[in-house]
């Protein structure tokens, strides 16, 4: 089944000076959930991540996420499996009222140094709806069959 959605939310962005020649975030395939984000490190100063190190990598853009949505910053599976490169605090959340440059916390969990070069696809960004709840303090919660069973309580 093919669905044509002409009512997609609009993601407005501002290109910063450090993002001057970078491609806009984009979906690599028609069915992709996430847009690729690229590294806005200087071309003559690639960033070297040694095993165990982490770095805050600029994207070169400010995003105006539509109200009622968030941008989730997630690792790219290829970087993770091939090189051990992942995003910390994943998924990272960009709130709709944030107006600073989006940066990605990358960590090298691999065994070898990894070089991040200008324009390299470093993460993916998923735009997702947000639900804000009303908070109510109570003295107890309703009972369930599971109860307070936590980690591993439903089986392996």
Curated annotation (Swiss-Prot):
What is the uppermost EC class here? Answer: hydrolase
Superkingdom of the organism of origin: Bacteria
What does the record list as coiled-coil region(s)? none
A Pfam family this protein belongs to?
dUTPase
Q: Please give the catalytic activity noted in the UniProt record.
A: dUTP + H2O = dUMP + diphosphate + H(+)
SUPFAM superfamilies documented for this protein: dUTPase-like (SSF51283)
Q: In which pathway does it act?
A: Pyrimidine metabolism; dUMP biosynthesis; dUMP from dCTP (dUTP route): step 2/2
* This protein's record includes keyword Hydrolase: yes
Could you say which residues bind substrate here? 76-78, 89, 93-95, 103
Keyword annotations for this protein, in alphabetical order, are: Hydrolase, Magnesium, Metal-binding, Nucleotide metabolism
Essential cofactor(s) = Mg(2+)
State the EC number(s).
Answer: 3.6.1.23
Job description of the protein = This enzyme is involved in nucleotide metabolism: it produces dUMP, the immediate precursor of thymidine nucleotides and it decreases the intracellular concentration of dUTP so that uracil cannot be incorporated into DNA.
Say which family it is in. Belongs to the dUTPase family.
Instruction: Tell me what this protein is called.
Output: Deoxyuridine 5'-triphosphate nucleotidohydrolase
